[in-house]
Regions:
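Conserved acidic residues
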Residues: 71, 119, 149
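Solvent-exposed alpha-helices and their adjacent loops that cap or buttress functional pockets
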Residues: 66, 113-117, 165
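Short, glycine/charge-rich flexible loops or terminal/linker lids adjacent to PRPP-binding catalytic cores
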Residues: 84-122, 130-135
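PRPP-dependent phosphoribosyltransferase catalytic core
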Residues: 2-16, 139-212
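Active-site-facing substrate-recognition patch
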Residues: 1-66
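Short glycine-rich phosphate-binding loop at a beta-alpha junction
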Residues: 68-77, 152
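Phosphate/pyrophosphate-binding loops at sites that engage ATP/ADP/AMP, CoA/4′-phosphopantetheine
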Residues: 59-71, 141-144
Length: 212
């Protein structure tokens, strides 16, 4: 299937398991501090064996197609640990995961797992919002001496601030679906109402100041 067909198909699957939540009156607060009427809980895909396998295979396919030089996989904690491990298993590659900060006990590791020296790493992420935590993981891997060849993720909001951050960091991002495809599919199927679309449009215009 084409990339556009994949994005539409995966968007439909996310809606089917009710992974998309809309709460304009009681907005979600993200780690970045932004308020959002919209939340994509794509970790729910792990609970459905057929869908879990779909995500694993499509992410693995994305790695093979776009980053064939990868010799290892790293997941971003905590959301992408499971997805990253599944992809690494499918590709038969070494795996590690990157914490948001070092453990405060034991080995105090930031990177958990052992990769070959100089490994070419593809990073697996579950969701991209501002890109901050994802690129923090990239930075940790680079400082540890690994080459980051790119990143694959299940979903992105496609914010300009994130796209700019990825460009500046020199990281290519490939995702299975995105905000535009999910909202279009939700609108087409009646998952959201027209007034909801207006709220989402207002939020998407300037999410940093929405509801402040």
């Amino acid at each position: 299937m084409t990339m556009n067909e994949l994005k539409k198909a995966f968007a439909a699957k996310l809606l089917n398991i009710k992974a998309i939540k809309l709460q304009p009156e009681n907005p979600f607060t993200w780690a970045s501090g932004w308020k959002s009427p919209f939340y994509c809980d794509n970790r729910k895909t792990l609970s459905y064996p057929t869908l879990r396998s779909f995500v694993k295979l499509e992410l693995a396919h994305a790695v093979l197609e776009h980053f064939p030089e990868a010799t290892a996989v790293a997941g971003v904690a905590t959301g992408a640990i499971a997805q990253g491990a599944l992809v690494a298993d499918e590709l038969n590659l070494p795996f590690c995961y990157v914490r948001s900060k070092p453990k405060d006990h034991g080995m105090q590791n930031l990177i958990e797992g052992t990769l070959p020296e100089g490994a070419k790493v593809v990073v697996v992420e579950d969701l991209i919002s501002t890109g901050g935590s994802s690129l923090k993981a990239v930075d940790a891997l680079r400082k540890a001496g690994f080459e980051v060849v790119g990143m694959v993720a299940s979903y992105t909001y496609g914010f300009p601030i994130a796209e700019q951050a990825f460009r500046e960091a020199g990281v290519r991002l490939v995702t299975l679906t995105d905000y535009e495809h999910v909202v279009a599919q939700a609108r087409e199927t009646g998952y959201i109402k027209e007034e909801d679309v207006e709220v989402l449009h207002a939020w998407r215009k300037d999410p940093a100041i929405w509801k402040k």
